[in-house]
Amino acid sequence: AMTNIDRKIMTLTARGIDCSKLSKYNNGEPFIDAKGNKVDDLAAVLYNYSGGYTINGPIFALNALDMGNYTIPENAVWTREKLLETILNHKYLSDGFGLDMVTMLMQSIAPYQNDPVYGERVKAKLWEGFDIVMDSFGTDPFDNPFGVQWGGVYTSEGASQIICALSAMGVDVHTDVRLNNGKDSVLTSFLNYADFDEGYFAHSNTTPKNAMATYQGCYATQWYLGFLNGGGAGHPYS
Protein backbone atom coordinates (compact mmCIF):
# COMPACT_ATOMS: atom_id res chain seq x y z
CA ALA A 1 0.00 0.00 0.00
CA MET A 2 1.10 3.56 -0.63
CA THR A 3 0.83 4.43 3.05
CA ASN A 4 3.21 1.60 3.99
CA ILE A 5 5.93 3.19 1.85
CA ASP A 6 5.06 6.61 3.28
CA ARG A 7 5.51 5.38 6.84
CA LYS A 8 8.82 3.68 6.11
CA ILE A 9 10.26 6.85 4.60
CA MET A 10 9.00 9.05 7.43
CA THR A 11 10.39 6.68 10.05
CA LEU A 12 13.79 6.31 8.42
CA THR A 13 14.10 9.99 7.54
CA ALA A 14 13.25 10.96 11.12
CA ARG A 15 16.23 8.83 12.17
CA GLY A 16 18.51 10.73 9.79
CA ILE A 17 18.60 8.11 7.05
CA ASP A 18 18.69 9.17 3.40
CA CYS A 19 15.99 7.04 1.79
CA SER A 20 17.18 7.91 -1.71
CA LYS A 21 20.45 6.00 -1.17
CA LEU A 22 19.89 3.12 1.23
CA SER A 23 22.96 1.24 0.01
CA LYS A 24 25.04 3.70 2.03
CA TYR A 25 23.83 1.88 5.11
CA ASN A 26 24.36 -1.65 3.78
CA ASN A 27 28.00 -1.80 2.66
CA GLY A 28 27.11 -0.40 -0.76
CA GLU A 29 24.47 -3.03 -1.45
CA PRO A 30 20.73 -2.40 -1.89
CA PHE A 31 18.32 -3.85 0.61
CA ILE A 32 15.99 -6.70 -0.33
CA ASP A 33 12.32 -6.15 0.44
CA ALA A 34 9.78 -8.76 1.51
CA LYS A 35 9.01 -9.58 -2.15
CA GLY A 36 12.65 -10.08 -3.04
CA ASN A 37 13.05 -6.76 -4.86
CA LYS A 38 16.30 -4.83 -4.56
CA VAL A 39 15.65 -1.40 -3.06
CA ASP A 40 18.22 1.37 -2.98
CA ASP A 41 16.06 4.45 -3.61
CA LEU A 42 12.95 4.11 -1.45
CA ALA A 43 11.86 7.65 -2.31
CA ALA A 44 11.69 6.59 -5.98
CA VAL A 45 9.58 3.59 -5.01
CA LEU A 46 7.12 6.05 -3.51
CA TYR A 47 7.00 8.72 -6.19
CA ASN A 48 6.71 6.04 -8.88
CA TYR A 49 3.99 4.14 -7.02
CA SER A 50 1.22 3.15 -9.44
CA GLY A 51 -1.17 1.13 -7.28
CA GLY A 52 -4.44 2.03 -5.66
CA TYR A 53 -4.72 4.44 -2.76
CA THR A 54 -7.03 6.39 -0.50
CA ILE A 55 -6.41 10.06 0.22
CA ASN A 56 -4.11 9.35 3.16
CA GLY A 57 -1.63 7.87 0.66
CA PRO A 58 -0.87 11.18 -1.12
CA ILE A 59 -1.13 13.12 2.16
CA PHE A 60 1.52 11.04 3.89
CA ALA A 61 3.56 10.83 0.68
CA LEU A 62 3.88 14.61 0.56
CA ASN A 63 4.87 14.64 4.23
CA ALA A 64 7.39 11.86 3.68
CA LEU A 65 9.02 13.40 0.61
CA ASP A 66 9.13 16.84 2.20
CA MET A 67 10.66 15.52 5.41
CA GLY A 68 13.83 14.60 3.56
CA ASN A 69 13.48 17.28 0.89
CA TYR A 70 13.73 14.45 -1.63
CA THR A 71 14.11 15.39 -5.30
CA ILE A 72 11.28 14.18 -7.54
CA PRO A 73 11.89 14.00 -11.31
CA GLU A 74 9.42 15.60 -13.71
CA ASN A 75 8.50 12.21 -15.20
CA ALA A 76 7.59 10.67 -11.83
CA VAL A 77 4.16 9.12 -11.37
CA TRP A 78 3.70 11.34 -8.32
CA THR A 79 5.33 14.74 -8.70
CA ARG A 80 4.88 17.27 -5.91
CA GLU A 81 2.48 19.09 -8.22
CA LYS A 82 0.34 15.98 -8.64
CA LEU A 83 0.40 15.31 -4.92
CA LEU A 84 -0.67 18.88 -4.17
CA GLU A 85 -3.40 18.86 -6.83
CA THR A 86 -4.77 15.57 -5.53
CA ILE A 87 -4.80 16.78 -1.95
CA LEU A 88 -6.19 20.24 -2.70
CA ASN A 89 -8.97 18.78 -4.84
CA HIS A 90 -10.02 16.33 -2.15
CA LYS A 91 -13.30 17.19 -0.47
CA TYR A 92 -13.04 17.32 3.29
CA LEU A 93 -14.99 14.62 5.18
CA SER A 94 -15.74 12.69 1.98
CA ASP A 95 -13.32 9.86 2.81
CA GLY A 96 -14.90 8.25 5.85
CA PHE A 97 -11.92 9.02 8.09
CA GLY A 98 -13.53 11.95 9.87
CA LEU A 99 -11.82 14.93 11.45
CA ASP A 100 -8.43 13.23 11.76
CA MET A 101 -8.03 13.16 7.99
CA VAL A 102 -9.06 16.81 7.78
CA THR A 103 -6.26 17.81 10.12
CA MET A 104 -3.72 15.44 8.55
CA LEU A 105 -4.49 16.95 5.16
CA MET A 106 -3.96 20.40 6.61
CA GLN A 107 -0.58 19.36 8.00
CA SER A 108 0.62 18.15 4.62
CA ILE A 109 -0.16 21.33 2.67
CA ALA A 110 0.65 23.95 5.32
CA PRO A 111 4.30 24.39 4.24
CA TYR A 112 3.04 25.59 0.85
CA GLN A 113 1.14 28.63 2.14
CA ASN A 114 3.60 31.00 0.49
CA ASP A 115 4.15 28.96 -2.65
CA PRO A 116 3.89 31.26 -5.71
CA VAL A 117 1.70 28.76 -7.56
CA TYR A 118 -0.31 26.99 -4.86
CA GLY A 119 -0.18 29.44 -1.97
CA GLU A 120 -3.63 31.00 -2.29
CA ARG A 121 -5.36 27.66 -2.81
CA VAL A 122 -3.47 26.20 0.13
CA LYS A 123 -4.52 29.05 2.41
CA ALA A 124 -8.15 28.70 1.35
CA LYS A 125 -8.04 24.95 1.99
CA LEU A 126 -6.45 25.48 5.39
CA TRP A 127 -9.07 27.96 6.53
CA GLU A 128 -11.82 25.69 5.26
CA GLY A 129 -10.31 22.98 7.44
CA PHE A 130 -10.01 25.40 10.35
CA ASP A 131 -13.75 26.06 10.20
CA ILE A 132 -14.43 22.32 10.29
CA VAL A 133 -12.20 22.00 13.34
CA MET A 134 -14.04 24.84 15.08
CA ASP A 135 -17.40 23.24 14.32
CA SER A 136 -16.20 19.93 15.79
CA PHE A 137 -15.57 21.19 19.32
CA GLY A 138 -17.89 20.23 22.15
CA THR A 139 -20.90 22.51 22.59
CA ASP A 140 -21.12 22.11 26.39
CA PRO A 141 -18.71 24.61 28.00
CA PHE A 142 -18.80 22.57 31.24
CA ASP A 143 -18.00 19.30 29.49
CA ASN A 144 -14.98 19.58 27.17
CA PRO A 145 -15.25 22.85 25.23
CA PHE A 146 -12.20 22.18 23.06
CA GLY A 147 -12.39 18.41 22.91
CA VAL A 148 -13.22 16.37 19.81
CA GLN A 149 -14.95 13.04 19.68
CA TRP A 150 -14.48 9.80 17.78
CA GLY A 151 -17.37 7.37 18.09
CA GLY A 152 -18.93 9.52 20.79
CA VAL A 153 -15.79 9.52 22.94
CA TYR A 154 -13.42 12.43 23.48
CA THR A 155 -9.92 11.35 22.42
CA SER A 156 -6.42 12.68 22.80
CA GLU A 157 -5.47 11.59 19.29
CA GLY A 158 -8.00 13.98 17.80
CA ALA A 159 -6.59 16.78 19.93
CA SER A 160 -3.04 15.85 18.87
CA GLN A 161 -3.84 16.12 15.18
CA ILE A 162 -5.55 19.48 15.69
CA ILE A 163 -2.47 20.85 17.45
CA CYS A 164 -0.24 19.71 14.58
CA ALA A 165 -2.52 21.15 11.90
CA LEU A 166 -3.11 24.53 13.50
CA SER A 167 0.51 24.95 14.56
CA ALA A 168 1.57 24.16 11.00
CA MET A 169 -0.66 26.90 9.62
CA GLY A 170 0.54 29.42 12.20
CA VAL A 171 -2.31 29.45 14.73
CA ASP A 172 -1.44 29.29 18.43
CA VAL A 173 -3.62 26.61 20.02
CA HIS A 174 -3.27 28.17 23.46
CA THR A 175 -3.35 31.95 23.04
CA ASP A 176 -5.57 32.44 19.98
CA VAL A 177 -8.85 33.89 21.25
CA ARG A 178 -10.84 31.51 19.08
CA LEU A 179 -9.19 28.57 20.85
CA ASN A 180 -9.16 29.88 24.41
CA ASN A 181 -12.22 30.78 26.48
CA GLY A 182 -10.28 32.39 29.32
CA LYS A 183 -10.16 29.15 31.29
CA ASP A 184 -9.49 26.35 28.84
CA SER A 185 -7.76 26.12 25.48
CA VAL A 186 -7.11 23.49 22.86
CA LEU A 187 -3.70 22.97 24.46
CA THR A 188 -4.97 22.55 28.03
CA SER A 189 -7.70 20.21 26.79
CA PHE A 190 -4.99 18.10 25.15
CA LEU A 191 -2.78 18.13 28.25
CA ASN A 192 -5.63 16.76 30.36
CA TYR A 193 -4.87 13.39 28.74
CA ALA A 194 -1.23 13.46 29.85
CA ASP A 195 0.03 11.54 32.87
CA PHE A 196 3.17 13.47 33.74
CA ASP A 197 4.19 11.08 36.53
CA GLU A 198 3.92 7.91 34.47
CA GLY A 199 4.98 9.49 31.17
CA TYR A 200 2.15 8.62 28.82
CA PHE A 201 -0.97 10.00 27.13
CA ALA A 202 -4.36 8.37 27.57
CA HIS A 203 -6.59 7.60 24.58
CA SER A 204 -9.64 8.84 26.48
CA ASN A 205 -10.69 9.56 30.03
CA THR A 206 -11.46 5.87 30.47
CA THR A 207 -8.60 4.34 28.44
CA PRO A 208 -5.21 5.14 30.02
CA LYS A 209 -1.69 4.17 28.96
CA ASN A 210 -2.35 3.94 25.25
CA ALA A 211 0.61 3.52 22.88
CA MET A 212 -0.93 5.29 19.88
CA ALA A 213 -2.15 8.15 22.03
CA THR A 214 1.31 8.49 23.57
CA TYR A 215 3.31 8.68 20.35
CA GLN A 216 0.78 11.02 18.76
CA GLY A 217 0.82 13.10 21.92
CA CYS A 218 4.60 13.27 21.87
CA TYR A 219 4.85 14.50 18.31
CA ALA A 220 2.00 16.98 18.85
CA THR A 221 3.97 18.33 21.80
CA GLN A 222 7.08 18.55 19.65
CA TRP A 223 5.10 20.27 16.90
CA TYR A 224 3.80 22.94 19.28
CA LEU A 225 7.25 23.47 20.77
CA GLY A 226 8.59 23.84 17.24
CA PHE A 227 5.88 26.39 16.56
CA LEU A 228 6.88 28.39 19.64
CA ASN A 229 10.62 28.13 19.07
CA GLY A 230 10.35 28.80 15.36
CA GLY A 231 8.14 31.81 15.79
CA GLY A 232 5.24 30.63 13.65
CA ALA A 233 3.98 28.16 11.10
CA GLY A 234 5.90 25.15 9.93
CA HIS A 235 6.75 21.52 10.52
CA PRO A 236 8.95 20.41 13.41
CA TYR A 237 11.30 18.93 10.82
CA SER A 238 11.59 22.11 8.75
Residue ranges and their predicted role:
Residues 47, 78, 127-130, 150, ...:
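A residue-identity detector for tryptophan
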Residues 21-46, 73-88, 119, 123-130, ...:
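Alpha-helical repeat scaffolds
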Residues 231-238:
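Intrinsically disordered, low-complexity repeat and linker tracts
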Residues 43-51, 84-92, 131-138, 188-195:
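HEAT/HEAT-like alpha-solenoid repeats
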Residues 1-21, 48-74, 89-125, 138-177, ...:
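An alpha-helical repeat/solenoid feature that recognizes helix-turn-helix modules
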